[in-house]
Amino acid sequence: MSNDRNAQELLKWGLANSGSTGVASFASQSVEQISADIEAGRRPDLADPNLYNAIMGKSEAQMMAEELSVAIDTSRTLPDRMTALDNFEMLIEQIDNANNMTSMKMWSPIISLLSAPEAEIQTAAAWIIGTAVQNNDKAQMAVLDFHPVAALLDLLHSHVDEVRAKAMYALSGLLKHNPAAMHQFDQLDGWNMLNMALVDPNLGLRRKTAFLINALLLQDPNSLDSQPASTSTATAIAPVSFTPPTPTAPPAPLERGPETLRTSIPHPNVARALVQSNIINTLISSLLPAHTLPDTLSPPPTGANGDSDARLDLDFAEKSAAAILTFTTKLPPSPSHPLDPTTISLFKALLVQLQAKPLDSSDPASTRWAELGIHAHDFDQFKHKIHAL
């Protein structure tokens, strides 16, 4: 059955069962006849726009607008606003709805909620941003006009764990393969905030930060020495054909890269930023025994009572080790930007630790590097790099 036929049958059913005076008698009319009567003013009982909503239900765009209206209304109760934000977040999990936020001018009010006085509202707003930009290059670019990076970095100062965690979640989605967002992040010295997050009392935030650092290294085409290069794919290239096209063959579609990679903005040099901000030193120190480090490099303990050793958290240790190994792949044989003696000594101390026994005596691995899930080939490359320093 066609969509038009479905619409006609549905409207007829609604008219027949509406209970309005004189409506049921017109149920046998076509949609075209009824529409003509409405336009001519002969059917005021059907001119109410709420009738369509009653029959068909509200569109998701309407629901988004209504939920956002409640969320930004400071006269409403906090539970009402939180429910509205939760509903809005579920709606924009659908990528088309997330992209509609731009045409519906919803980005500005959502970004403004990041500075709301209520931590719960801040958390929900950051969650919405993170969900909207997740694997969505169009949303990643659209939101940049509203300067979300600065607002999200500010939230990393929050005393509320969940606010900081959701801010990091949103940042991770926003910065993913996005040189324009990375440029904003770099200009705002976001590296300093990442360094602080690596020693956050909340171990969950440390894990998220280490994971993000590794992701930024992996997406960066630069080595430690290279100048930032544009990652633009703005020029569309058609696949090359080695046989003459037949007259009936359709033209080959042009390849179009993600919106985030269609700018001429160069990706910042992540490896160099990690050195200049001391993030690499913080990462390495997090995997070394505290008693072997100077006070300035010893990471604070974690846990509710401040008595937990982050090295014993396998998830955090694995993510930190992965980021460190990725960093070493960026080191050229003879770097023109040599590492300072402190960083070199930390690398050599880490090599010793990774070759030692696992921290968990029940782990079947024979070495710390195997305990952290590092492949033998990758560890050999790491060892070669460190010996060359």
Swiss-Prot record:
GO biological process: regulation of translation
Gene source species: Mycosarcoma maydis (Corn smut fungus)
Database matches in Pfam families: Fes1
Family assignment from sequence similarity: Belongs to the FES1 family.
Compartments (UniProt record): Cytoplasm
UniProt-recorded Gene Ontology molecular function terms: adenyl-nucleotide exchange factor activity
Residue spans of the ARM repeats: 95-134, 137-176, 179-218, 268-310
Keyword Cytoplasm: yes
Superkingdom, natural source: Eukaryota
Region span, Disordered: 223-255
Keyword set, alphabetical order: Cytoplasm, Repeat, Translation regulation
Underlying gene: FES1
Function in brief: Functions as a nucleotide exchange factor (NEF) for Hsp70 chaperones which accelerates the release of ADP. Required for fully efficient Hsp70-mediated folding of proteins.
Protein name in the entry: Hsp70 nucleotide exchange factor FES1
Primary localisation category: cytoplasm
GO cellular component: endoplasmic reticulum
